[in-house]
């Protein structure tokens, strides 16, 4: 079967779904939507892998190295477990062996049969795991040394691991300050050993983990930084002293750690769940949450968002800028969707048919999950490769089709139309 992306593929999928609903006079079930998505995989993707884990993971992040193993590219991911107290929890390192062509952005057709193992069965395998105190709500590696991984659990305790070690030696430090569950955890890409955390206790803490002492206390704390649960914290991508937070109190705040002051206090109509700073523009950042919209902001004037992007049908749970492609943003949500946004297309003119398909900035909608998506990660080494983790133990790894012009380059001209 030749892998060709019909320019109207998304419209065709919508038409098929609409026809199925009209025929049954009832909305499609989640399983029916999944089967429809699966039938369109060869048309919409260069690669898809789905792995069912023993327990759900609330977190996923690609590790930066890649290795060539038996003519396949091996990439590793950070995963966690959430066993609800039924079994021991673990920090896990997963590995996936990708077909070499997945690392290329080739538009060449290739033959894929329905049982193509390269495309479908490159499952994530757990290659290393470390016992962990409680469920892992977030895990992130330190950019300056990817052997160092920080985790935070349901009690707000933070742990520092060295994944190059084994057994009890791998746990280097325990960081105690927060008193409740935490989802905010971020290393500073511009300052080694600098860690940021936020939790349900409404507090934010900054940590220096350089000594790897058994027990570490925060260097700076922001007591009652918010008046409700903190959903996320992130460092600015290029300014080492600036970070942001979002909260259930319907505020988003930007801080300067040099003065321990809030530099922007932004009131939002609904609580935001997540935020992200652009790696290409020092002024651009994004945030999203419970009103299903993805907002773009200019840090120089935060009085109003630059733009609000529509596409999700439920709360947005995670957003991430593409580290390889300027203007590309990913968002995932409780609607079981990950949307790939092309910010360069905002405001582009559309035909009536295109308007019915959705906003011009929607480049791709990944619709392969059956439950809410907990976290997403964009691969820093392989263009357009994404990992997404859902509530129902599933991790999917996928790469949009290189036949999509923005992904594979300018479309080739079909000279036959001139005959």
From Swiss-Prot:
<dbReference type="GO" id="GO:0005634">
    <property type="term" value="C:nucleus"/>
</dbReference>
<feature type="repeat" description="WD 5">
    <location>
        <begin position="311"/>
        <end position="351"/>
    </location>
</feature>
<dbReference type="Pfam" id="PF12265">
    <property type="entry name" value="CAF1C_H4-bd"/>
</dbReference>
<comment type="function">
    <text>Regulatory subunit of the histone acetylase B (HAT-B) complex. The complex acetylates Lys-12 of histone H4 which is required for telomeric silencing.</text>
</comment>
<dbReference type="InterPro" id="IPR019775">
    <property type="entry name" value="WD40_repeat_CS"/>
</dbReference>
<keyword id="KW-0539">Nucleus</keyword>
<dbReference type="GO" id="GO:0042393">
    <property type="term" value="F:histone binding"/>
</dbReference>
<dbReference type="InterPro" id="IPR036322">
    <property type="entry name" value="WD40_repeat_dom_sf"/>
</dbReference>
<dbReference type="Pfam" id="PF00400">
    <property type="entry name" value="WD40"/>
</dbReference>
<comment type="subunit">
    <text>Component of the HAT-B complex composed of at least HAT1 and HAT2. The HAT-B complex binds to histone H4 tail.</text>
</comment>
<dbReference type="InterPro" id="IPR022052">
    <property type="entry name" value="Histone-bd_RBBP4-like_N"/>
</dbReference>
<feature type="site" description="Important for interaction with HAT1">
    <location>
        <position position="284"/>
    </location>
</feature>
<feature type="repeat" description="WD 4">
    <location>
        <begin position="267"/>
        <end position="307"/>
    </location>
</feature>
<feature type="repeat" description="WD 1">
    <location>
        <begin position="131"/>
        <end position="171"/>
    </location>
</feature>
<keyword id="KW-0156">Chromatin regulator</keyword>
<dbReference type="InterPro" id="IPR001680">
    <property type="entry name" value="WD40_rpt"/>
</dbReference>
<feature type="repeat" description="WD 2">
    <location>
        <begin position="177"/>
        <end position="217"/>
    </location>
</feature>
<dbReference type="GO" id="GO:0000781">
    <property type="term" value="C:chromosome, telomeric region"/>
</dbReference>
<protein>
    <recommendedName>
        <fullName>Histone acetyltransferase type B subunit 2</fullName>
    </recommendedName>
</protein>
<keyword id="KW-0963">Cytoplasm</keyword>
<dbReference type="InterPro" id="IPR015943">
    <property type="entry name" value="WD40/YVTN_repeat-like_dom_sf"/>
</dbReference>
<dbReference type="GO" id="GO:0000123">
    <property type="term" value="C:histone acetyltransferase complex"/>
</dbReference>
<feature type="repeat" description="WD 3">
    <location>
        <begin position="225"/>
        <end position="265"/>
    </location>
</feature>
<feature type="region of interest" description="Interaction with the histone H4 N-terminus">
    <location>
        <begin position="353"/>
        <end position="357"/>
    </location>
</feature>
<dbReference type="GO" id="GO:0004402">
    <property type="term" value="F:histone acetyltransferase activity"/>
</dbReference>
<comment type="similarity">
    <text>Belongs to the WD repeat RBAP46/RBAP48/MSI1 family.</text>
</comment>
<dbReference type="GO" id="GO:0005737">
    <property type="term" value="C:cytoplasm"/>
</dbReference>
<keyword id="KW-0853">WD repeat</keyword>
<dbReference type="GO" id="GO:0031509">
    <property type="term" value="P:subtelomeric heterochromatin formation"/>
</dbReference>
<keyword id="KW-0677">Repeat</keyword>
<feature type="repeat" description="WD 6">
    <location>
        <begin position="368"/>
        <end position="408"/>
    </location>
</feature>
<dbReference type="InterPro" id="IPR050459">
    <property type="entry name" value="WD_repeat_RBAP46/RBAP48/MSI1"/>
</dbReference>
């Amino acid at each position: 079967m030749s892998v060709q992306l019909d320019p109207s593929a998304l419209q065709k999928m919508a038409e098929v779904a609409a026809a199925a609903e009209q025929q049954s006079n009832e909305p499609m079930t989640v399983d029916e939507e999944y089967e429809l998505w699966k039938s369109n995989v060869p048309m919409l993707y260069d690669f898809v892998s789905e792995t069912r884990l023993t327990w759900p993971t609330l977190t996923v992040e690609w590790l930066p190295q890649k290795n060539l193993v038996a003519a396949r590219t091996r990439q590793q991911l950070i995963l966690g477990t959430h066993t609800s107290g039924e079994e021991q929890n673990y920090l896990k390192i997963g590995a996936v062996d990708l077909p070499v062509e997945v690392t290329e952005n080739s538009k060449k057709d290739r033959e894929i049969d329905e049982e193509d193992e390269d495309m479908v069965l490159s499952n994530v395998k757990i290659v290393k795991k470390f016992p962990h105190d409680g469920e892992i709500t977030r895990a992130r590696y330190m950019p300056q040394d990817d052997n160092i991984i920080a985790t935070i659990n349901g009690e707000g305790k933070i742990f520092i691991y060295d994944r190059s070690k084994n057994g009890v030696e791998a746990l280097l430090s325990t960081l105690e300050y927060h008193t409740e569950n935490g989802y905010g955890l971020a290393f500073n890409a511009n300052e080694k050993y600098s860690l940021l955390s936020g939790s349900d206790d409404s507090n934010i803490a900054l940590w220096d983990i350089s000594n790897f002492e058994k027990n570490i206390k925060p260097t700076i704390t922001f007591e009652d930084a918010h008046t409700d649960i903190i959903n996320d914290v992130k460092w600015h991508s290029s300014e080492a002293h600036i970070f942001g937070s979002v909260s259930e109190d319907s505020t988003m705040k930007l801080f300067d750690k040099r003065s321990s002051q809030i530099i922007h206090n932004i009131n939002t109509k609904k609580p935001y769940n997540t935020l992200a700073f652009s790696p290409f523009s020092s002024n651009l950042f994004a945030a999203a949450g419970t009103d299903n919209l993805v907002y773009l902001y200019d840090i120089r004037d935060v009085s109003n968002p630059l733009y609000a992007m529509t596409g999700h049908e439920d709360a947005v749970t995670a957003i991430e800028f593409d580290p390889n492609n300027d203007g590309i943003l990913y968002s995932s949500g409780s609607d079981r969707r990950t949307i790939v946004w092309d910010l360069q297309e905002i405001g582009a003119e559309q035909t009536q048919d295109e308007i019915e398909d959705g906003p011009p900035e929607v480049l791709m909608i990944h619709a392969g999950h059956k439950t809410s998506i907990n976290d997403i990660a964009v691969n820093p080494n392989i263009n357009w490769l994404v990992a997404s983790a859902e509530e129902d133990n599933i991790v999917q790894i996928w790469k949009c089709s290189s036949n999509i012009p923005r992904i594979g380059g300018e479309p080739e001209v079909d000279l036959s139309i001139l005959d």
